[in-house]
């Protein structure tokens, strides 16, 4: 059977995906007919307006808006609460709200991690919005314990529940009274209104709620702490969607002779092996170990903006030493992390980690000819953006635009401190609470060589013809990046590899024939 290219979608047993099928002539004619029927603006007029939106006049209007947000680089609070819950053993996240919200959270994480994500909803509808959702919550808890048999339920809320003032503490008490759950069944909760804060706020308050519950449980008994020659340190990564980071924290501390307890460890729950057996609750911080966390020597809090409430709780209620650190990304960030661990635990930095540091420095030296002087724009969560900025400064790159939609009041001062420490930070402008439509104006009016951020930047990348290095959350359109660390010296090497190879790929695409070579050498290699 012979077919013409434009009709390949009609060939039996051959199904084209959306990338190809809508290029067929039949669909192209439909699109043109649709434009004509809708009396659409001429293509020339559309292009004129588009070009205008890329200029300085539109930028000024864009930055003058106050009552409109366009494409914010953030999600809502309960999404972060779900991730916090997934970091603990046998925990079922329960979101008090509509089914649609929970479907969004599950699909968002499933697309990023490529893993099934357990989460339940109280299925609030119009009736519950008017008369209250106590029956929904009680019934949900009864069904969850009967069907899914969790060890712990972590309850958060959506905007529907918050607008009508749902009282989680009272509702959970009612569930116990009505024997939907037993009197001693572990339930933590946090109020996570969607209309304030962001996913990092939700992560923080849910983690705090879980730790409060564990600290009051029967397992929170100092006599149950196992005897060990190793110092135990709590490590709190925060809203960190890099599975590889969690494993790297454990590896680093174990190399230093420290017993690490990751509080909120989703490295197994969101990266379980395909071994033929399905486990609804793989991994997570053991609840019994979490209950003993308040007896650790100290807590290392690795996201200052994200974990502010959790850090305050640990310091004030547990009376525990709380060490606030920037995310240990790059040479300086990892140096500070290892120095803090060595000081608190009274241990030495082993030779293996010193060698890893040397390899990262060597790799930076090898690649500096290609990364040095490149102008970059960075967008994402505040703690990650600060760490990324510090790393690109180490590489001799020039951060020009720094955007964080969900930045807190301390973000700008913290960022300016990082920028002022390097001559490469002199051109940078910090934009807290701005969205990706603002970033689009910035990139067109003050061009850059590279974008660094989540997949949400891909539209700017394509329109402005600027390559994107995907770092952060969410990343649906590339696979397995979250499985590798970006923290520590090893993670820094992974991130450097992404950066320099993206630049080299772009050079290959644009090189004239006389520069299109098989070997790309560093200056050191060329000299040798």
From Swiss-Prot:
Its EC number is 1.18.6.1. The keyword Nucleotide-binding applies. Its cofactor is [8Fe-7S] cluster. GO terms for cellular component: molybdenum-iron nitrogenase complex. The keyword tRNA-binding does not apply. Keywords: ATP-binding, Iron, Iron-sulfur, Metal-binding, Nitrogen fixation, Nucleotide-binding, Oxidoreductase. It catalyses: N2 + 8 reduced [2Fe-2S]-[ferredoxin] + 16 ATP + 16 H2O = H2 + 8 oxidized [2Fe-2S]-[ferredoxin] + 2 NH4(+) + 16 ADP + 16 phosphate + 6 H(+). [8Fe-7S] cluster binds at residues 76, 101, 159, 194. GO terms for biological process: nitrogen fixation. Binds 1 [8Fe-7S] cluster per heterodimer. SUPFAM superfamilies: Helical backbone' metal receptor (SSF53807). It holds the Pfam family DUF3364. InterPro entries: ChlB/BchB/BchZ, Nase/OxRdtase_comp1, Nase_comp1_CS, Nase_Mo-Fe_CF_bsu, Nase_Mo-Fe_CF_bsu_N. GO terms for molecular function: ATP binding; iron-sulfur cluster binding; metal ion binding; nitrogenase activity. It is an enzyme of class 1 (oxidoreductase). Belongs to the NifD/NifK/NifE/NifN family. This molybdenum-iron protein is part of the nitrogenase complex that catalyzes the key enzymatic reactions in nitrogen fixation. Cys-194 is present instead of the usual Ser that serves as a ligand for the 8Fe-7S cluster in the oxidized state. Tetramer of two alpha and two beta chains. Forms complex with the iron protein (nitrogenase component 2). This is Nitrogenase molybdenum-iron protein beta chain. The lineage of its organism: Bacteria, Bacillati, Actinomycetota, Actinomycetes, Frankiales.
């Amino acid at each position: 059977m012979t077919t013409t290219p434009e009709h390949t979608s009609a060939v039996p047993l051959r199904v084209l995906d959306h990338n190809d099928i809508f290029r067929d002539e039949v669909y192209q004619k439909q699109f043109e007919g649709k434009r004509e029927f809708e009396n659409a603006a001429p293509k020339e007029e559309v292009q004129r307006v588009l070009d205008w939106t890329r200029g300085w006049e539109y930028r000024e209007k864009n930055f003058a808006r106050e009552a409109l947000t366009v494409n914010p680089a953030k999600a809502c609070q309960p999404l972060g609460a779900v991730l916090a819950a997934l970091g603990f053993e046998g925990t079922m996240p329960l979101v008090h709200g509509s089914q649609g919200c929970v479907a969004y959270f599950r699909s968002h994480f499933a697309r990023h991690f490529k893993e099934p994500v357990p989460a339940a909803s109280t299925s609030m509808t119009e009736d519950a919005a008017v008369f209250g959702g106590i029956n929904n919550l009680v019934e949900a808890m009864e069904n969850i314990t009967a069907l899914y048999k969790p060890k712990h339920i972590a309850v958060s809320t959506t905007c529907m529940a918050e607008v009508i003032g749902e009282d989680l503490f009272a509702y959970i008490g009612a569930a116990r009274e009505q024997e939907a759950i037993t009197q001693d069944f572990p339930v933590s909760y946090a109020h996570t209104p969607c209309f304030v804060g962001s996913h990092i706020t939700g992560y923080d308050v849910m983690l705090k709620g879980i730790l409060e519950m564990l600290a009051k449980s029967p397992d929170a008994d100092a006599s149950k702490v196992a005897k060990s020659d190793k110092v135990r340190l709590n490590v709190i990564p925060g809203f960190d969607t890099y599975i590889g980071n969690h494993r790297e924290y454990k590896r680093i501390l174990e190399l230093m002779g420290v017993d690490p307890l990751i509080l909120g460890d989703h490295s197994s729950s969101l990266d379980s092996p395909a071994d033929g057996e399905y486990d609804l609750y793989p991994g997570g911080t053991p609840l019994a170990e979490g209950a003993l966390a308040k007896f650790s020597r100290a807590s290392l809090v690795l996201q200052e903006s994200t974990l502010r409430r959790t850090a305050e709780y640990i310091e004030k209620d547990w009376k525990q030493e709380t060490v606030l650190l920037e995310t240990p990304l790059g040479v300086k960030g990892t140096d500070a992390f290892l120095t803090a661990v060595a000081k608190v635990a009274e241990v030495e930095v082993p030779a293996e980690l010193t060698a890893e540091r040397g390899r990262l420095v060597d790799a930076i030296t090898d690649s500096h000819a290609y990364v040095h002087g490149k102008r970059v724009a960075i967008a994402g969560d505040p703690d990650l953006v600060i760490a990324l900025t510090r790393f690109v400064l180490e590489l001799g790159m020039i951060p020009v635009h720094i955007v964080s939609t969900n930045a807190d009041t301390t973000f700008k001062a913290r960022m300016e401190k990082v920028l002022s420490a390097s001559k490469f930070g002199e051109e940078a402008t910090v934009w807290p609470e701005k969205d990706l439509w603002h970033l689009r104006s910035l990139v067109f009016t003050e061009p850059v060589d590279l974008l660094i951020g989540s997949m949400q930047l891909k539209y700017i990348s394509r329109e402005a013809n600027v390559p994107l290095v995907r770092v952060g959350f969410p990343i649906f359109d590339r696979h397995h990046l979250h499985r590798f660390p970006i923290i520590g010296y090893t993670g820094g090497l992974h991130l450097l590899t992404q950066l320099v190879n993206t630049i080299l790929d772009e050079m290959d695409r644009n090189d004239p024939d006389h520069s299109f070579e098989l070997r790309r050498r560093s200056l050191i290699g060329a000299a040798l």
